């Protein structure tokens, strides 16, 4: 009887080991299937959430960063997209600023996905969506820290993530947006929230914002993406997130004219839906297409 019990115990232990092993590999493979020729990739998925913003980064070591959650109606959409990527937990949630098209969907996300911690812009706002977002974080006991200028986000030793802009009392919601520069070896990506020209001018003056990939601020609004800002960033690629039938005229024709004049390649959620970016720190692929960039 004891021998049988030991045998069953051994078989069960082996079963658990291989189940965990293959489960891990299935998840890892599912995240990198389209870029199997890249080892240790940094992946960014810019989600199509209509007239809003949401994106997720999967760092080379497997850590995950969710930036914004779209509006209220798209919270469930973000959850489905995360699950398709086999993401059931988020190591860091970045709430760039308190506008509803960025934080509205976070209530559903926090209810469905385990969030380890939140990085917030520090900009307070008197709105129902902002109140519910803060209340849910409190009820879920999710720690919130306020982003500080030049703060380093330490999640993967091979990827530098730096805060270049965050909330100030004198700033509007948009100009309080958290701006992140993500650098993986030779490749840099600038993620800009909804900043407008005032914040752009401060970044030009005080920060190194040069990057091969630029997430265009404020959905391509005329209030952002000045010529001086584009010269300072000097991107090869621009990512734009907006709804085709939005009521704001995004992206503004003046912004698109500047991008075209400077020869900056554009990827839009209107055209592509979700946009996939993958890099090993040397080569850059967007929508499975290699994009030649200068290091």
Please state what every model-predicted region is.
Residues 2-295:
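Non-globular, low-confidence helical/coil segments that flank catalytic cores
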């Amino acid at each position: 009887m004891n021998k049988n019990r030991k045998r069953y115990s051994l078989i069960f232990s082996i079963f658990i080991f291989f189940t965990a092993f293959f489960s891990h590999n299935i998840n890892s493979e599912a995240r990198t299937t389209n870029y199997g020729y890249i080892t240790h990739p940094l992946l960014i998925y810019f989600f199509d959430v209509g007239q809003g913003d949401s994106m997720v980064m999967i760092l080379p070591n497997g850590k995950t960063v969710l930036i914004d959650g779209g509006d209220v109606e798209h919270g469930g959409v973000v959850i489905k997209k995360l699950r398709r990527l086999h993401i059931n937990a988020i190591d860091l949630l970045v709430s760039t600023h308190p506008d509803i098209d960025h934080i509205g969907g976070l209530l559903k996300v926090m209810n469905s996905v385990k969030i380890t911690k939140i990085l917030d812009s520090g900009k307070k706002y008197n709105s129902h969506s902002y109140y519910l977002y803060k209340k849910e974080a409190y009820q879920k006991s999710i720690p919130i820290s306020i982003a500080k200028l030049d703060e380093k986000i330490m999640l993967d030793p091979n990827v530098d993530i730096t805060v270049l802009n965050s909330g100030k009392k004198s700033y509007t919601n948009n100009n309080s947006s958290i701006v992140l520069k993500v650098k993986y070896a030779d490749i840099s990506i600038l993620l800009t929230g909804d900043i407008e020209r005032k914040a752009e001018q401060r970044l030009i003056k005080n920060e190194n914002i040069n990057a091969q990939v630029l997430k265009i601020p404020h959905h391509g609004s005329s209030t952002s993406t000045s010529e001086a800002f584009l010269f300072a960033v000097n991107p090869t690629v621009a990512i734009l997130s907006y709804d085709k039938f939005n009521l704001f005229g995004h992206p503004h024709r003046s912004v698109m004219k500047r991008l075209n004049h400077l020869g900056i390649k554009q990827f839009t959620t209107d055209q592509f839906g979700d946009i996939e970016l993958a890099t090993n720190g040397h080569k850059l692929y967007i929508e499975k297409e290699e994009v030649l960039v200068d290091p």
